[in-house]
A protein has these predicted regions:
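Coiled-coil termination/hinge junctions
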Residues: 295-321
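ABC ATP-binding cassette signature C-motif
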Residues: 1-230, 314-489
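Extended, highly charged alpha-helical segments
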Residues: 89-109, 198-303, 407-409
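Generic structural signal for residues positioned in beta-strands
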Residues: 3, 247, 286, 305-307, ...
Length: 489
């Protein structure tokens, strides 16, 4: 059993409450997903459960973890810097569990992930693996260690379709506890038996959470129905209040006018009117008490508001965007052949998606295409890499990254756009190393929007986006008036 009691998490820099009085009990066999908007604390919660020291630099935490005999394993959203320069063999041999496995067991583990046993002994550096291969390697090492609790932060990132199906089956077959975050609605719906929803309301000044033992689809449906019922009830009560207040105002004014015009020669009538006014005022006080008990208008987080591509992004129908031929595609070190006879043509506002298995060369191909298109003077191309840090200086703030001129009007405009993407005023001035993966992705997409690009080159653009933001991004890309070249699973 995994239990969390009265957990409170507050951001050290802006004192924003991320979680307040959070309580959770997970039992053997539970598959729990944490959902919520970007920057709502999903990754922070996973890190704290695994090791509170992982969040101590930026968050003040209080609460109790009760783990009992559970053995925890954690898959971070990104490969830690300390592991990037290690070879694949060094990565696996760093755990005793690797040497405790027989060659037969290692072979069986590798086969489950559609890898050869030689993968364990590779000399290739971890940071040169494809995004999907990095995730596979980390998952493999976790399974070798035989934990009882899996803490997985976006485990579906960069995985091909076959490996996504494997991940789904591994989660469903896991006999212990699984707690994970994911932007993949299909994975969530097919695996999760518990939904943990983290919300930040009132411009992220109020934290709220819900824990529901149900499927994600039913939770969303029931939540929408409850929201609609409460909204209707609150609106009905407010409508009745308006009618009641209007009637009360007429009564009050009528008695007040009568009192002001009563003759001194009619003391009995004056007394009756004063008694009536006393009753009317008592009625008003009763109404005030009733108003305090009215159903509150329900609140929920809204999806991000974002624009991608205006008139300047329109691509003429006949314009050749790429006519790309490549005899051979090899790994960056030139040692492994990935593909032969590649020929791609893209004209006008067409949308091109590159798919394939992990390690097939999708990112390598996209990088070469990006290098060509970014150098073209007849196009305005923008590139969003799989690794955001390739373009982002993590010590800079989002505002500084998006505008280096310092112009007040420009910065005001940028802050308005960031606000529409659910950034608080404080988050706009945080170093980007403190932002979540989804928030970093938002910064890059906003950079593309501000640049008036007419060609977007995107490597897994929806990774790290919440299930609420993901559909918005997909619809924006589909409606983009320029060309799009993208990798996606």
């Amino acid at each position: 059993m995994l239990q969390i009691k009265n957990l409170n998490i507050e951001h050290r820099r802006d004192l924003r409450v991320i979680l307040e009085n959070f309580n959770l009990v997970l039992n053997t066999g539970d598959k729990a997903v944490i959902v919520g908007e970007e920057g709502n604390g999903k990754s922070t919660l996973l890190k704290w459960i695994f090791d509170p020291a992982l969040v101590a630099a930026y968050a003040e935490c209080s609460g109790e973890r009760i783990l009992g005999a559970e053995r925890l394993a954690y898959l971070p959203q990104e490969l830690p810097d300390a592991l990037k320069e290690k070879s694949v063999y060094e990565f696996f041999s760093a755990t005793d569990a690797f040497f405790d496995c027989s060659p037969k067991e290692l072979s069986e583990f590798a086969a489950r992930f559609r890898l050869s046993p030689e993968f364990f002994y590779g000399e290739q550096r971890m940071d040169t693996l494809s995004g999907g291969e990095k995730v596979k390697a980390q998952l493999l090492r976790i399974f070798l260690e035989r934990p009882t609790v899996l803490l997985l932060d976006e485990p579906s990132n960069d995985l091909d379709l076959a490996t996504l199906e494997l991940l789904e089956s591994l989660i469903n077959a896991w006999e212990g506890i699984v707690l994970f975050t994911s932007h993949d609605e299909t994975l969530i719906e097919r695996t999760a038996t518990v939904v943990i929803h983290l919300e930040q309301l009132k411009r992220k000044s109020e934290s709220r959470y819900a824990v529901v033992r149900d499927t994600y689809a039913r939770y969303r449906q029931q939540r929408a129905e409850l929201f609609a019922r409460k909204t209707q009830q609150a609106e009905n009560e407010r409508k009745e209040k308006r009618l009641r207040d209007e009637k009360y105002a007429r009564l009050y004014n009528s008695v007040e006018r009568a009192l002001s015009s009563v003759s001194r020669q009619a003391p009995g009538e004056g007394k009756n009117l004063k008694d009536k006014m006393h009753v009317v005022k008592a009625m008003g006080k009763r109404f005030e008490k009733e108003d305090a008990e009215m159903t509150e208008m329900p609140e929920q987080e809204e999806a991000i508001f974002f624009r991608l591509g205006g008139e300047s992004a329109v691509m003429p129908q006949g314009k050749t965007v790429i006519d790309y031929a490549l005899a051979e595609l090899k790994t960056p070190d030139g040692e492994r052949l990935l593909a032969r006879g590649i020929h791609l043509k893209l004209r006008g506002p067409e949308k091109l998606c590159i798919i394939g298995e992990n390690g097939a060369g999708k990112t390598s191909l996209l990088r070469r295409i990006a290098a060509d298109l970014l150098a073209r003077k007849d196009l305005r191309a923008q590139y969003m890499p799989q690794n955001y840090e390739d373009l982002l200086d993590l010590e800079r703030t989002p505002v500084d990254f998006l505008d280096s001129s310092g112009d007040k009007a420009v910065r005001t405009k940028i802050r308005t756009y960031l606000g529409a993407l659910k950034f608080t005023a404080e988050e706009m001035d945080h170093p980007m190393r403190e932002l979540s993966g989804g928030q970093k992705a938002k910064v890059l997409l906003l950079k593309m929007s501000l640049s008036d690009a007419n060609v977007l080159i995107l490597d897994e653009p929806t990774r790290n986006f919440s299930p609420l933001s993901g559909p918005v991004i997909r619809s924006l890309l589909a409606a983009f008036p320029g060309a799009v070249i993208s990798i996606s699973h």
